[in-house]
């Protein structure tokens, strides 16, 4: 579901990720970025620092605006905002473990007003990285 929705993004993909080790999701994001879709993300600093198969470096090397969060605690969001109209969120980390072993959930919200609220939170979290 996530990759299918990302593959159909036309204008923008914003994401906040605690754990991001999914090659499939990373490849979908990179593909859309190559096609001109705006892509920006914030990932949890502790997870990036542990670098256990994470996608941070891969995305950064693909010239995607990906940053480490700047808060003292965990940046525990698991959110995609697609075309400022669709939100994907839930317990699901963007990880191989979530795909293959864990019981996880996501909810997909098709509502521009709700997407705008998530976008405000993304912008707040992103501003703390600077």
Annotate each predicted stretch with a short phrase.
Residues 19-23, 45-49, 72-75, 86-87, ...:
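Solvent-exposed loop/turn segments at secondary-structure junctions
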Residues 5-6, 59, 74, 119, ...:
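Generic detector of leucine side chains in alpha-helical contexts
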Residues 86-130:
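Signature of lipid phosphatidyltransferase scaffolds
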């Amino acid at each position: 579901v996530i990759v299918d929705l990302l593959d159909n993004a036309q204008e923008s993909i914003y994401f906040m990720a605690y754990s991001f080790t999914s090659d499939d999701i990373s490849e979908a994001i990179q593909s859309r970025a190559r096609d001109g879709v705006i892509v920006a993300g914030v990932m949890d600093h502790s997870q990036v620092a542990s670098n256990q198969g994470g996608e941070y470096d891969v995305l950064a090397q693909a010239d995607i605006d990906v940053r480490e969060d700047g808060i003292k605690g965990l940046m525990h969001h698991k959110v995609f905002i697609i075309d400022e109209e669709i939100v994907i969120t839930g317990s699901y980390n963007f990880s191989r473990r979530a795909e293959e072993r864990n019981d996880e959930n996501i909810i997909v919200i098709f509502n521009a007003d709700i997407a705008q609220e998530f976008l405000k939170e993304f912008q707040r979290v992103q501003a703390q990285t600077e």
